[in-house]
């Protein structure tokens, strides 16, 4: 998924099912964009990682 689409899904501007939402957030985490956008992106990404919904970029590269 490209970064723009991921951001639009995360913001709720594009409709998406649960799997697409998880993929969008994982894309934002993998690219680091989650930490560069508004604060709630990073906070939400961190919560998804802590809840086991998404993996940290470090976990994926290990």
Give residue ranges: language-model regions.
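Catalytic phosphate/metal-binding cores of nucleic-acid and nucleotide-processing enzymes, i.e., regions
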Residues: 1-62
């Amino acid at each position: 998924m490209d970064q723009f689409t991921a951001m639009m899904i995360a913001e709720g501007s594009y409709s998406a099912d649960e799997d697409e939402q998880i993929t969008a957030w994982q894309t934002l985490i993998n690219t680091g964009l989650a930490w560069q956008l508004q604060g709630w992106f990073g906070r939400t990404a961190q919560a998804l990682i802590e809840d086991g919904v998404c993996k940290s970029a470090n976990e994926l590269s290990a």
